Amino acid sequence: MGYAIDGIPSTGYRLVAAPDALDADEVLPDTRPERLGTRVHLLAETRSTNDDAWRLAREGAPEGSIVIAECQTGGKGRKGRVWVSPKGVNLYTSIVLRPPIPPSQAPLLTLLAGVAVAEVIREDHGIEAGIKWPNDVLIDGKKVAGILSEMSAEADRVHFLVVGIGVNLNMTEEMFPPDLLHPATSLFLVTGTKVDRASFARSLYGRLDRWYATFLARGGEPVREAWLAWCVHRDRWLEVLTLSGRQSGRFAGLDDEGCLLLESGGAAPARISAGDVVRSRQMPSAEPVSNEGGG
């Protein structure tokens, strides 16, 4: 797809419209990120950008390699769910990272990605967003973005991490399947204005690069503090579905590895490393945690 150009007699030419298709040269900031964008792989169609990034990482792709696709035929969500990925309307991207950290700290990079997405939405588009643990970015309670991180590691070190990000930018109502598990939206549906996908990608990669540099230099605490400022769980009673059953309690923050903490009526907070928040309600007063299922 080419650029639309008008010829003006005795003057020259002017650009009327740029193509909607993404261009690998236009998705990175003018000031190249320090770590992200060492390689950019732009695909017209793929099954999953995470699968592509994983393959590249195993083949030795350098840290900061980016995969970005116009559409996915099998976009991946958490727990085997499918990320709906129509062509030419959203952002589907995965990034290869090789942080010198133990596996226990890897969840912090999922939180970092959520913070970067929320910042772009608010600061570039003027929309208040929030983050739902562990990986959803919401607008007015509806999911607008998700993050899926996958890791190759040994007991004491990470070989590489693939951070996949999907952001609903220009989807219309009819593009969403009717049987979605959770309500979803797009920036277009919220604002009524079409989003420049390349511009969104440039801003996101720049913010991801800065946050990643902060994480490597200062550890996870700045990431955790930023995530808590964006989270939608403050003063909420949560019900969380885990592999061992359901746990409920008052949101008590995150630990230093990004695990969810639920207050337990005076005892040490319950620590949840993986699960889905399936219910949330305002809590005027403390209630004890109830646990269903094994430990």
Short names for language-model regions:
Residues 1-122, 143, 195, 292-295:
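N-terminal lobe of the biotin/lipoate ligase/transferase fold
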Residues 7-9, 132, 254:
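Short, ordered beta-strand-loop transition motifs
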Residues 44, 131-133:
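Short loop/edge segments at beta-strand edges and connector loops
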Residues 101-107, 111-129, 139-295:
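Long, positively charged amphipathic alpha-helical accessory segments at protein N-termini or as interdomain linkers
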Residues 136:
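Conserved active-site carboxylates
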